[in-house]
């Protein structure tokens, strides 16, 4: 995974000049948008643990002024299947990733090379369980620097670096590099399309006592 991120960075560094998100005219709402979708998903031999299960995912995102948002809520074992690998596990996992555009906030074009826009980036992750009853409970808050980077074929790719605060242990614990993309690559006559969507999260610098 480390090599994948390095390759992405090198690819971005050699990509074509970018169309910057210019807010110098004061109109911070000109790029506003919002979207939401529901997906019924199936996981097969999902790592770690080779877990197979179904889940409902509500995914959403958008832009309003200086704020950019992406998030999702997963509800596991929706059919309450007794043979599911998620029986007895946390029912819900939530991720929210709000970012504040420094370009829009300051009115200064901060683009350079393939970097289209710069953000103060944050990420919140919860699974709805209590650390006292579940030693693997997820309660993380992350803060750092984010960007939109233009990459050949993929187009705009989010690339963020966070410091991680473990809300359960009340302590800072390492860092995370995250990248995400959404690339429509085949279009139908009715306007629908097939897309390639994904993300990579790479954690490093974790404390031994929490690993």
Q: For each predicted feature, which ranges?
A:
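Cleavable N-terminal export/targeting peptides
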Residues: 1-31
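Short loop/turn motifs that connect adjacent beta-strands in outer-membrane beta-barrel proteins
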Residues: 21-34, 61-70, 102-119, 150-158, ...
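Hydrophobic, lipid-facing positions within transmembrane beta-strands of outer-membrane proteins
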Residues: 36, 54-58, 94-96, 141-145, ...
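N-terminal carbohydrate-binding/catalytic regions of secreted carbohydrate-active enzymes
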Residues: 38, 45-98
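Transmembrane beta-strands of outer-membrane beta-barrel pores
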Residues: 40-46, 75-79, 122-130, 161-167, ...
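Outer-membrane beta-barrel proteins
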Residues: 47, 80-82, 107-109, 129-133, ...
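Surface-exposed loop and membrane-interface regions of Gram-negative outer-membrane beta-barrel proteins
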Residues: 72-131
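Detector for outer-membrane/organellar transmembrane beta-barrel domains
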Residues: 136-211
């Amino acid at each position: 995974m480390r090599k994948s991120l390095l390759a992405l960075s090198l690819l971005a560094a050699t990509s074509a000049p970018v169309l910057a998100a210019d807010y110098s005219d004061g109109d911070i709402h000109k790029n506003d948008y919002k979207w939401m979708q529901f997906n019924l998903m199936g996981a097969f031999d999902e790592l770690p643990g080779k877990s197979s299960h179904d889940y409902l995912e509500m995914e959403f995102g958008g832009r309003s002024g200086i704020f950019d948002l992406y998030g999702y809520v997963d509800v596991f074992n929706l059919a309450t299947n007794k043979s599911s690998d998620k029986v007895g596990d946390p029912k819900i996992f939530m991720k929210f990733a709000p970012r504040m555009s420094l370009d829009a906030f300051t009115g200064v074009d901060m683009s350079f090379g393939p970097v289209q826009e710069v953000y103060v980036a944050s990420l919140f992750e919860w699974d709805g369980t209590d650390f006292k009853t579940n030693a693997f409970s997820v309660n993380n808050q992350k803060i750092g620097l984010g960007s939109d980077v233009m990459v050949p074929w993929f187009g705009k790719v989010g690339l963020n670096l966070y410091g991680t605060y473990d809300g359960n242990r009340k302590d800072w614990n390492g860092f995370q590099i995250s990248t995400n993309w959404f690339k429509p690559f085949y279009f139908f006559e009715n306007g629908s399309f097939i897309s390639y969507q994904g993300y990579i999260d790479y954690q490093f610098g974790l404390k031994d006592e929490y690993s």
